[in-house]
């Protein structure tokens, strides 16, 4: 049995489980079930599901792959993620529950007006569509190499089939189903990583007791970087950026907040947020350990491109190498598709919700049957759009996947973060019709700053802190729009 058919069989079995769970949990779902899970989701299941939703295929492939060049510097940002999650839990979640929002961008309409509301919704649409497509693109490339290319199928067929499968299990139940399917994905993801770590360690003749010291002794396991403020890996850059990254991409993201707000009340939602964030630190640590083991095992036999190691290809190359049993390759595929399909499925649901509620405002017509028809048509439209974006990115991509995702988030989530910061910190009203102008100009200013930072600021490199700068520029722009009493 060839590798391609083994992978296909693995995917088919995995999707069979997803379809069964989705059908059981979502067969009676109405619009409230799709959008909010009827506010009845158990907080501990949401916490487990949140892990699967926040860890995408990019994390699964690129975090271990980035260890060679960046060591464990990513953990500095992950620690910031935890602090950011505390802020989301204590500040944003109670506010969203008090306002009883279906879409969190309804806050912008209440605070500023319709122009700001639509601006936030459109920025989320662009952010999530491009971000989710980039994440899923990474997985499609791996599946194309292992399955579709050996079978003579073009990349476009790969993308259409995989997105269609995601649409099939998510279109009926929405959040009500995703909470349970994503919990399965989280379980598969963790089991996959643990199995790979254990087997690779065994191949290196490392027992469980020897593994910590071997990892600590390797040069790739350095976590903290305090020596050079100009370095993109500098601790305070990554830690502070991680705080604001989570506030923007979790607390102000309809995707992850949609499942968080499906809990019964804000207390349970807070528990979910804090617990899932704590567990995520441990799981990211597993990915980093896996990265060190992969490079220890590969030695000098790293996949290369233009004379440089290709980090994103290391995990797949090792998992499917001749010296490893098929079981490890299968676990790699299970973990990969669990991470990827979880993120893509929840993104489609969130995009459908925001576009239907925020942009089309179909929920305000008072016709539930019409709302259902609109929601289902939008869901199809979001799927088609994602297919198109992935294919375009396939022909344009020339950057490391994880940096592309976070750079994208810094540009598109910055204005959303800025609007919420201004709205919460200042009670003054602004000229709502000019808010879209500020939110478009701000990322353009930040792009110019980032491209010229080393030349203008004595070698200083703007990296992940770009999100903070973008938000601050947006806040300054909104201050200029304050109405005079």
Residues of each region from the PLM?
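Membrane-embedded helix-loop-helix hairpins and adjacent transmembrane boundary segments
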Residues: 1-485
């Amino acid at each position: 049995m060839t590798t391609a058919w083994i992978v296909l069989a693995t995917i088919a079995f995995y999707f069979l489980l997803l379809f069964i769970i989705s059908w059981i949990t979502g067969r009676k779902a109405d619009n409230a079930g799709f959008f909010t899970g009827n506010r009845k989701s158990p907080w501990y299941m949401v916490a487990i599901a949140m892990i699967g939703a926040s860890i995408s295929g990019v994390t699964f492939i690129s975090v271990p792959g980035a260890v060679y060049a960046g060591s464990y510097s990513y953990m500095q940002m992950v620690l910031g993620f935890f602090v950011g999650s505390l802020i989301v839990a204590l500040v944003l979640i109670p506010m969203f529950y008090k306002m009883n929002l279906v879409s969190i961008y309804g806050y912008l309409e209440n605070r500023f007006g319709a122009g700001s509301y639509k601006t936030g919704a459109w920025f989320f649409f662009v952010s999530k569509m491009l971000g989710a497509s980039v994440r899923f693109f990474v997985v499609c490339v791996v599946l194309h190499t292992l399955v579709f290319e050996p079978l003579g199928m073009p990349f476009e067929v790969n993308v259409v089939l995989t997105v269609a499968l995601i649409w099939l299990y998510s279109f009926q139940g929405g959040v009500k189903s995703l909470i349970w399917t994503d919990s399965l994905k989280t379980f598969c993801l963790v089991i996959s990583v643990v199995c790979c770590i254990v087997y690779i360690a065994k191949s290196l003749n490392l027992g469980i007791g020897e593994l910590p010291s071997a990892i600590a002794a390797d040069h790739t396991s350095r976590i903290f970087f305090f020596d050079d403020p100009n370095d993109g890996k500098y601790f305070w850059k990554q830690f502070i950026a991680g705080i604001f990254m989570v506030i923007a991409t979790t607390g102000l993201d309809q995707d992850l907040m949609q499942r968080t707000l499906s809990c019964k009340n804000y207390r349970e939602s807070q528990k979910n947020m804090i617990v899932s964030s704590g567990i995520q630190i441990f799981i990211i640590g597993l990915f980093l350990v896996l990265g060190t083991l992969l490079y220890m095992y590969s030695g000098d036999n790293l996949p290369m491109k233009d004379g440089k190691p290709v980090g994103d290809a290391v995990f797949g190359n090792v998992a499917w190498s001749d010296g490893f049993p098929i079981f490890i390759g299968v676990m790699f595929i299970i973990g990969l598709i669990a991470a990827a399909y979880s993120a893509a499925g929840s993104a489609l649901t969130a995009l459908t919700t925001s576009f239907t509620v925020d942009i089309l405002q179909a929920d305000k017509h008072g016709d539930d049957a019409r709302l259902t028809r609109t929601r289902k048509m939008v869901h199809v439209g979001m799927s088609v759009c994602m297919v198109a974006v992935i294919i375009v990115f396939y022909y344009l991509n020339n950057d490391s996947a994880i940096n592309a995702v976070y750079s994208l988030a810094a540009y598109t989530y910055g204005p959303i973060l800025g609007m919420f910061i201004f709205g919460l910190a200042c009670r003054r009203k602004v000229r709502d019709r000019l808010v879209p102008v500020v939110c478009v100009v701000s990322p353009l200013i930040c792009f110019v700053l980032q491209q010229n930072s080393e030349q203008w600021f004595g070698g200083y490199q703007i990296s992940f802190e770009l999100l903070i700068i973008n938000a601050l520029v947006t806040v300054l722009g909104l201050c200029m729009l304050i109405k005079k009493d």
